[in-house]
Amino acid sequence: VRIYRGRTTFGRKLLLLLAATLIAFSTARAQDVQAMDAWGAYKQAQKLDGQGKYAEAIAKYKQIAPEFVKQRQYGNAAGMYRRIGDDYAKLQQYDNAVAGWELEAKYSGLAGQTQISIAAKRRADMLRSKASLFVETTAGAVGGANAHGAKFEPKNGALLGAYAELDPAVHNPKTANPFYTDRFPALTGKKHAAYLLYFTYGQPFSSIKSHVDHARAAGTAIELGLQPLKGLGEVKDDAYLHQLARDIEASGVQVFLRFANEMNGDWVIWHTKDPNEYIAKFRLVAKVFHREAPNSVAMVWAPDRLPEYNIQDYYPGDDAVDWVGVSLYSIFDPSLDPLGQGEDRSSHLEKFDNIYKLYAARKPVFVSEGGVSYMYPEKKQDKTDWAVYKMNEFYATLPMLYPKVKAVFWFDSNHDASARIKNYMLSANPKLLAGYKQSVSSPFYLSSFGDESPIAYKPASAASPVPASPQRVSAYVKTWSPTLAKVTYAIGGRTVATAASPPWTAQIDFAPYGGKKIEVDVRAYDGRNKLVTTQKVPVSVK
């Protein structure tokens, strides 16, 4: 009996094994069929693309992509969403294109395709349409909400700065007449609080005596770009470093000490693939200057905005860093236009976003050098109008989107350490100069240490109510169009205000809407008066 039962048990096991094998085979077969169906549908979608039937192709790609996601074939899924985004762009349905590329970024990231993910996100950002509203208020209304209590930090507002010694219209290095501390304010119509100087590590502080003397006489500070041009190895805890700190402390001039900036980029000689090496040197310099120059020096850590992925690796620590800066430039580049129309659709303003989100909660953040070029250098094409728009939008909207920004330095030169001509010089372009004058005339931008902006901004949204009274309203409006010419505001279908330039400031009376939640329709138009986008912004009125 036991043998019989054993045979029965064995037989049952064999039957179960055969059944499991059949099920597994059937499942694999089903998956193979699904895969074959997916690739068959893909070929059909490609054919539809070739015929210009983009909507039908999109429908096919949308059937395929989820199947690849289910099978965790994330690279293939990303490819499908790339095509969905591309086809929506061809149909000029840009919001849908953005959604497709965002999914491409997501799944290419899951597939470990980092660069593809970054490129997809960049395309999405360039075509993304959005709007944010702000109301102007007083500095007293925001109090210390935007301050950190750091050395040299204005409670509200941003110190105005520039690099100007290479502009021949404002500075003659041989005769010191003119000198930029005098002539640059005359050129721009406003006193600047600080000027950037480059300084080679190992030189005595006395080598820039004329700059220090003029800064002291003009009541301006210095952002000292301390550069170890022989590499980090020359930076030691020695007599030179301590003497440099003592000399700066005795100078009577306030100094932002920007040590070895842009360290995250491989184009600087002090770049190291081992961030700990850089961090150790920064912390050494910070330790010496905090001890030897406690009244005159604020330590500045200033990476380049790119590459983003390694910025945090080089951060030396809160105890070593007083301010966080960033290099922020825009040069017209049509090669990345998602629509292939030869436009640069990037936002100069949003290039500040990453560094702000990373550090503004704990440190004063600022643009330690930056500018917008008025030439497309590769083609020698004039892009003044584009540059003026981007510059005006940047200075006008920066205080609204990034209220904890504490200084902005314009790079007033057409040259830097590279051989490439960059075209940022204000005196060389009357329209750019006029735009700069307009941009920095805002009282938010401060001419001296100790000043405070009388104005501030608060969001106008469902979460941040506005008073039921007339308000001075501004907006940040980002669209696929590189520039805009007009923005209108409508409530309940009725246009209540119109503005003709960034930050799209207008007077809107919210009194009729007290105690209500409303939608403000923000309509943006291009230079041909064509509607580009309508963004509905929910606003609570108290």
What positions do the PLM features span?
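Substrate-binding cleft of secreted/luminal carbohydrate-active enzymes
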Residues: 158-165, 256, 366-454
